[in-house]
Amino acid sequence: AEMIEKRHRIEDALEAVKAAQQEGIVPGGGVALVRALPKKAGSTAEQIVYEAVKEPIRQMARNAGESPDLILEQVQKEEGSRGYNFATGKMGDLLEEGVIDPVKVTITALTMAASAAGTLLTTGYAIIEGE
């Protein structure tokens, strides 16, 4: 079972490298998604996507034992590739520090968020799992 897990991790890493080579990289740690946001969301669909793309950085903060709202606020004050490095616990230039995501992965995340927003808008009722 452990060997299978290691194999899957290696395969995932290889796919990420291929994706990065094909389409490039962006700052990781959820920063590229936050930077893609407009300053304010307008329509209901935009509001859903607006909140959805903030969730990866919030989850990483929770996983690191940090305050999701505080980390998100700090990252939103920064510009470019500056963000919170969860490995060091400090703000920094994530591209320089090697905290990166393939563009393809980031685009997929935005596409999925938009798809979820569309589904929610066309659904009469939804059961939402609370925290």
Residue ranges and their predicted role:
Residues A1-E131:
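Extended, low-charge hydrophobic alpha-helical regions
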